[in-house]
Curated annotation (Swiss-Prot):
Keyword Magnesium part of the UniProt annotation: no
InterPro entries (UniProt xref): Ribosomal_bL19, Ribosomal_bL19_CS, Ribosomal_bL19_sf, Translation_prot_SH3-like_sf
UniProt-listed Pfam families: Ribosomal_L19 (PF01245)
Summary of the function given for this chain in its UniProt record: This protein is located at the 30S-50S ribosomal subunit interface and may play a role in the structure and function of the aminoacyl-tRNA binding site.
GO annotations of cellular component type: cytosolic large ribosomal subunit
This protein's name: Large ribosomal subunit protein bL19
Family: Belongs to the bacterial ribosomal protein bL19 family.
Organism this protein belongs to: Sulfurovum sp. (strain NBC37-1)
Annotated GO biological process: translation
Keywords, ordered alphabetically: Ribonucleoprotein, Ribosomal protein
Sample GO molecular function, one term: structural constituent of ribosome
Amino acid sequence: MRNKYIESFEKAQLENRNIPEFRAGDTVKVAVRIKEGSKERVQNYEGLCIAIRGQGTGRTFMVRKMGANSVGVERIFPLYSDSIESIEVLRKGRVRRAKLFYLRELKGKAARIKELRRK
């Protein structure tokens, strides 16, 4: 059971956010604001969403991309972070699991996810 004051505060925080609907298995592009000294830039991080966890303002999602030399790079993003400028869903994946950690052991074409066909 959650505190009603915390729930009302979180509800006010979540109202003004424009976050698309996505699930584990979807390919997403996350535009992250990075501050380097006095400069600020936006870096795109594109990969497969392999997990979503938490609730309310503490909700996070994990994105896995294949880096150089076929090395997998995973990054955890807070969903309602101010450093996230935008989230774009590129592909909807067809999976039957909520957490896709089994993809860590797969390599090459075996690690692909089928695209969800729209009716």
